[in-house]
Amino acid sequence: MARKRNENSLAENRKARHDYFVEEAMEAGLVLVGTEVKSIRNGRVNLKDCYADIYNGEIFVKNMHISPYEQGNIFNVDPLRERKLLLHRDEIRRLDGLVSRDGYTLIPLSLYLKDGKVKVALGVCKGKKNYDKRDSMLEKAHKRDMDRAIKEKNKY
């Protein structure tokens, strides 16, 4: 059975939890221009290969693809442009300290609406090795089999 999608969830980076260990997640605002919000509300956003970097005390998301809005004409911007994240200075410093450790990076996990504003769930992640991915897939399969067996047993 497919997972129910949250009503105010706009996009989700499903590969992030497969490719990375998510150590910590936090909410950040996103600076958008013009018709990007309309395009995001239509679900025309891709988080698959995006990541965040810290420059001069500011965090920017790279490779987040927001398709141009069809009725946007001259107000459309570059779909892959860098977008600034809105966080407090002390939060940025703390994230900078976490990411400076070897192997850690900032990955956007999902986009959602909160009080009419687009927010990003930003995760501090460490990359998985291939054997970690296989182990997590096996754990998922075992859990699914156990749930199926319990459901069958409780059926009668």
UniProtKB/Swiss-Prot annotation:
Alphabetical list of InterPro entries matching this protein: SmpB (IPR023620), SsrA-bd_prot (IPR000037), SsrA-bd_prot_CS (IPR020081)
Keyword tags: Cytoplasm, RNA-binding
Subcellular location: Cytoplasm
UniProt-listed Gene3D superfamilies: 2.40.280.10
Any single biological process term in GO: trans-translation
Highest taxon, organism lineage: Bacteria
Any one cellular-component term (Gene Ontology): cytosol
Cysteines engaged in disulfide bonds, as pairs: none
GO molecular function, a single term: RNA binding
Family: Belongs to the SmpB family.
PANTHER family with a match to the protein in the record: SSRA-BINDING PROTEIN, TMRNA-BINDING COMPONENT OF TRANS-TRANSLATION TAGGING COMPLEX
UniProt function note: Required for rescue of stalled ribosomes mediated by trans-translation. Binds to transfer-messenger RNA (tmRNA), required for stable association of tmRNA with ribosomes. tmRNA and SmpB together mimic tRNA shape, replacing the anticodon stem-loop with SmpB. tmRNA is encoded by the ssrA gene; the 2 termini fold to resemble tRNA(Ala) and it encodes a 'tag peptide', a short internal open reading frame. During trans-translation Ala-aminoacylated tmRNA acts like a tRNA, entering the A-site of stalled ribosomes, displacing the stalled mRNA.
Protein name: SsrA-binding protein
Gene behind this protein: smpB
